[in-house]
Amino acid sequence: MRYAASFTLALSLFSHAQSLVRGNPAKPCYPGICKLPDCFCSGTEIPGNLSVSSIPQIVFVSFDAFVSSAPFFFYETLFDGSLKNPNGCNISATFFVSLEYTNYCEVQDLYSQRHEIGHNSISCLLPSSWWANATQEGQREEILGMRDILRKWGNVKAEDVKGYRAPYIQVGGNMEFKVLKDEGFLYESSMPTQKFTDPPLWPYTLDYRSSQDCQIPPCPNGMCES
């Protein structure tokens, strides 16, 4: 049974050699032109035309907001080494960390255990409409500021903070994505879908127009130009 509220997370990867241009509509994506490893069209086709039986089940585990003693106890229980990936390595997660209430010693512990550390902004300001309407400078202060805080207080290398999830999964349109691209982030994890649930949407790049439904506008519609 498909629930109306169900969604998958689309991780929109950025091409290093291109820049997002605000207000310039993206062109349609053609798989014959947009090819891995640097480009991939949005959709449900398995990368590399692999068969379903030839790929493992992929589970993306992530947590939002602050890291403190109470949830850290749960993380220690969940990631105690008893659950393994097919290659024998321990499972891991991505933590999208925000400023308030976070214990940065525990962030460092998670980082040293090879969990991924992303972030969820500094302030998680309310109302959520702030994130939809934020200026480029406002987005930059939140996005760069939290990465710098993780570096200073959590001892997380800035270059290892590659992912961002907007507060309340309220994306900021082309403005937000331009800041992320300009500052070297590799993916964004804030865009839910109701259209692509079975089969699910695969991670895709923003070199061309996305086919994903926009559940929480404004979604990016600009194009990446050389």
Predicted features and spans:
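Cleavable N-terminal signal peptides of Sec/SRP-targeted secreted and luminal proteins
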Residues: 2-19
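Active-site beta->alpha N-cap acidic-glycine motif
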Residues: 20-116, 123-128, 138, 142-202, ...
